């Protein structure tokens, strides 16, 4: 799996899991699957929407929200660059990612090669090792 929904909190936060979000302000980016998922995963949380990740991240840093949720691949960048926040280890969903290819002649073979390469990297745990090395996940 390439991505899953996770939580980013301030380093001194007492939030350790999605169960701790009741009554807390949780930031999401409008129109994302994270917004939709949070409504069912944490119905007692106060969901606060933002136009983009940078604004939501700033709100977390400024204490306007208690947690920020999105794909772990997005949130990991903030945690990697800023030790005043931390990414909680649990993933609450599996988020599919896609690769866009041009329609037409030759695309079928390219798609097969890409699919093979990704599956091979998953089978050999290359993706897991890269995530741990570079994203600290």
Question: What do these predicted regions represent?
Answer:
Residues 19-22, 40-41, 54-69, 73, ...:
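Short helices/loops that flank or line small-molecule/ion binding pockets
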Residues 19, 35-36, 57-58, 76-77, ...:
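Alpha-helical elements of the RecA-like P-loop NTPase motor core of helicases
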Residues 9-26:
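Flexible hinge/capping segments at coil-to-helix
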Residues 33-50, 83-91, 118-137:
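Ligand-binding clefts/hinges and TM-proximal coupling segments of bilobed small-molecule sensing domains
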Residues 1-11, 72, 76-119, 136-137:
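Periplasmic-binding protein-like
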Residues 12-14, 33, 48-58, 62, ...:
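Short helix-initiation/N-cap motifs at beta->coil->alpha
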